[in-house]
Amino acid sequence: MKLTVQQLVRPEIAAIGAYHVAAADGFIKLDAMENPWPLPIELQHELAAELAQVALNRYPDADGGGLKAALRAAFAIPAAAGIVLGNGSDELITLVTQALARPGAKLLALEPSFVMYKMNALFSGLQYVGVPLRADFTLDLPATLAAIEREQPAVVFVSYPNNPTGPRYGRDEVMAICRAAPGLVVVDEAYQSFASDSFMDLAGELDNLLVMRTLSKLGLAGIRLGYAAASPAWINELNKVRPPYNVNVLTIAAARFALKHLDVFNRQAAELRAERAKLSAALAALPQLAAFPSEANFVTVRAPDAPALFQHLKASGILIKQLHGSHPLLENCLRLTVGSPDENAALLSAIQRFFV
């Protein structure tokens, strides 16, 4: 007798929905923390010429065509740290959870945070432990340390700064987590280009620290490249579960090209930080909204009726992220990506119209 799909699929997988990506054609797209600017036209032409030389008939080499060395030089990755590349940071999370999924092992994360920590615990068979943030989205360090002591997790994920809330925890707080954790601590620095601190200087020095980043928020979301730095012992184990040739030759070539022009992306990041400050101030000036501090390229707000404001913005041609309903602490919250000056002006105008 043949079994049905429902009989074959794990019950915990059958019970969830697939990750939903909203259709964005025709919208001002402020839902996914993307850089609003394409490459300058002259760099587009140079990149096209570079990609035309890529040998598409060959697999990528084991070192990523020199990409690891380029990343190390561009982002001051310590010489003591090894590097692993991923098809976006999502794949790096998968590698970590797969490598650590012993029977009974636990993954601990702060909540609310990046949804893929919890999802990958489910996919890999790790027990998930969530530790709530305080109501203002700051870290409850005593509760976190108590949970680490009680649960003895194999891995702790810390989003630094935190998505989807925006604040960056104190460096001393994260150091306390590293000291208390019996296993690996993953510091996810996806938004490092917009933040005032980094743990990259300790990669390879702290034995239980892995620093994870992506080029997506910098302006290269389309090429799907993540990288992580940690002691060589950790990188060696992650490479055992990493699929061969996981980063394709076009991504490698595009990333190496972009790193030669990092000044362009750094200028854009600086402009987005300035726009974030303006947007945050304008949102905070609206008495109907509570705007939370952010060191990322988005601002999270709480509104009296977030679903209604979300629908109003959508009807106005602006797509944002509705957080309401995803976690109790995110009740009536919305996440607004920092866009270009014109996009931010349109967003503010639409919000102001809603409250008239």
Swiss-Prot record:
Modified residues (N6-(pyridoxal phosphate)lysine): 217
Protein name: Histidinol-phosphate aminotransferase
Annotated disulfide bonds: none
HAMAP family membership: HisC_aminotrans_2
Cofactor(s) needed: pyridoxal 5'-phosphate
Tree of life domain: Bacteria
Keywords assigned: Amino-acid biosynthesis, Aminotransferase, Histidine biosynthesis, Pyridoxal phosphate, Transferase
Keyword hit for NAD: no
GO MF terms held by the record: histidinol-phosphate transaminase activity; pyridoxal phosphate binding
NCBIfam families in the cross-refs: hisC
EC nos: 2.6.1.9
Subunit annotation: Homodimer.
Catalytic activity: L-histidinol phosphate + 2-oxoglutarate = 3-(imidazol-4-yl)-2-oxopropyl phosphate + L-glutamate
Matches recorded under InterPro entries: Aminotransferase_I/II_large (IPR004839), HisP_aminotrans (IPR005861), PyrdxlP-dep_Trfase (IPR015424), PyrdxlP-dep_Trfase_major (IPR015421), PyrdxlP-dep_Trfase_small (IPR015422)
Pathway involvement of the protein, from the record: Amino-acid biosynthesis; L-histidine biosynthesis; L-histidine from 5-phospho-alpha-D-ribose 1-diphosphate: step 7/9
Biological process terms in GO annotation: L-histidine biosynthetic process
Family: Belongs to the class-II pyridoxal-phosphate-dependent aminotransferase family. Histidinol-phosphate aminotransferase subfamily.
Enzyme class of the recorded protein, top EC level: transferase
